[in-house]
Amino acid sequence: MGKMKILKKLLSKKGQLSMEVGVLVAAAVLVAIIAAYFYVKNAKSAVASAGNKSAAFINVTANKSQEYISNLSNI
């Protein structure tokens, strides 16, 4: 019975959504937009960070491989 009261409150007599539901939907959309903005912002910085880390890894492996090659030449 409580569900029917909520349903009646959400819907007006003409079957249109009430102002409360409109505000609730607008708030949900706003939260989704804000969350998407921060997700994209963090994804962008994560890509840059991954690029820097991969470049550093390539440099380390290049240095180590050069070191091993020079050690082999000394044998």
Curated annotation (Swiss-Prot):
Swiss-Prot/TrEMBL keywords: Fimbrium, Secreted
Sequence motif QXSXEXXXL, location on chain: 16-24
Annotated InterPro entries: Class3_signal_pept_motif (IPR007166)
Superkingdom of the organism of origin: Archaea
Keyword Secreted in annotation: yes
Record's keyword annotation contains Secreted: yes
Reported modifications of this chain: The N-terminus is cleaved by the prepilin peptidase EppA, which recognizes the class III signal sequence.
GO CC annotations on file: cell surface; extracellular region; membrane
Primary subcellular site in the record, as a coarse category: secreted
Subcellular location: Secreted; Cell surface; Fimbrium
Transmembrane segments: none
Propeptide part(s) removed at maturation, as residue ranges: 1-15
Pfam families reported for this sequence: Class_IIIsignal (PF04021)
Domain notes: Contains an amino terminal motif QXSXEXXXL, which is part of a class III signal sequence.
Name of protein: Probable pilin MJ0431
